[in-house]
């Protein structure tokens, strides 16, 4: 095929209950894009019924598409290889193979999740965004680094779309339920406290879902329950996006996926991005949910940059994670640069640091060098939830910074706590954060990080936000930022603590990951229960369902 001419690709999307066919050119012009959603006769989606829906509707959509673009003009066939429901993926792959063989054109299977990101970039001005991808089956925070889209944060159990749909079914709302939850939430005026579970850059939604169902069953107004569910879950999503933003220092945030159509979620992220001085993007509604155009576009990107597939390579992959894809179409020299410099988040000059939760300023407390950590109000959260979170985390951090010293772990000294304004004044530590040391090539000290984590776990303390930004290395190694910390002797909680750290290292220290992680594990093994925690880590990682 002559790749110098404008290619036309047809894309088939069928990972769950939506059947999509799209046609796009290599210049990014969408010639056809239509999706038909399967609405189950009873609650819930049966995989076989969804697959039958694809078998019927692909034929209809293909016929319609070929009235817009004649079949002889198709140069490439693309389809969603995964992740998704097995029966749906098989029907989609079979449809694509049949067309490819009948017109003798090449075929490309693509990752569904990354397709959302790339169509979002095509349809907005985003170049190198931190992406929040939210849908019925997926909840991920993604960032491109080191030839891959890294999963920096994700749900530890159910996806946000699934959470909203399950709640809607429980309340006898039609499918898809998220639309009706949003509608009811607009008329809610009473915020009810529900579980708010953030672990580093990951979230858990199952407890929130159960609690919301119980509120509904207890005869609370459905408008108020929907309002509280939406405010709580979307605040969690916005927070982990903000945490990932502080960790990666990206200059852009993009929202994609079916749940991206929710106006309240878009509003929250827009406010957060304004507070963090970064750009926010969301594609038009047509390209938020599952669609064939996004599949066709990623197929073109991969094909033009050398990707080729034989029919034997087109077997669907139901657990096809975003970080399994080798990205061949992004070239570093063109990736979000201004005059050759990579764009990054801008921190205000009066601060020495700006995290996801707090502004950090340097000063003096009596005769001592100090920093003040202020948990600032978050404009995206309701005032009730914001006050609760900031107060709880301010007090918790002060308590844990004192507690870990009793375990022989170095931490800043607390000078003063201003609970009313959510401020902590503490000693200034001369040193570099571990993130900077690793970027400079220093690795050996990472064994100390493992030992520190082991000591915390011996003392029953789980940090819940372990990243290389939360250790300061000087003559000794200090651990900071305990706002998400808790006491727990559960092996799984300790395993998740390590998983949070492991994912944060992979996201920005990918080229040094093995050396850094091995050093940390070596140090952690000084903890007498280390082996059981490390084994549990493997089990928890295997459970990652929403890919």
From Swiss-Prot:
Entries under InterPro entries matching the protein: ATPase_NBD (IPR043129), Bud32 (IPR022495), Gcp-like_dom (IPR000905), KAE1/TsaD (IPR017861), Kae1_archaea_euk (IPR034680), Kinase-like_dom_sf (IPR011009), RIO_dom (IPR018934), tRNA_threonyl_synthase/kinase (IPR009220)
Disulfide bonds: none
Cofactor stoichiometry and binding remark: Binds 1 Fe(2+) ion per subunit.
Keyword Transferase applies: yes
Major enzyme class: transferase
GO biological process, one term: tRNA threonylcarbamoyladenosine modification
Catalytic activity: L-seryl-[protein] + ATP = O-phospho-L-seryl-[protein] + ADP + H(+); L-threonyl-[protein] + ATP = O-phospho-L-threonyl-[protein] + ADP + H(+); L-threonylcarbamoyladenylate + adenosine(37) in tRNA = N(6)-L-threonylcarbamoyladenosine(37) in tRNA + AMP + H(+)
Subunit structure: Component of the KEOPS complex that consists of Kae1, Bud32, Cgi121 and Pcc1; the whole complex dimerizes.
UniProt protein name: Probable bifunctional tRNA threonylcarbamoyladenosine biosynthesis protein
Native source species: Methanococcus maripaludis (strain C7 / ATCC BAA-1331)
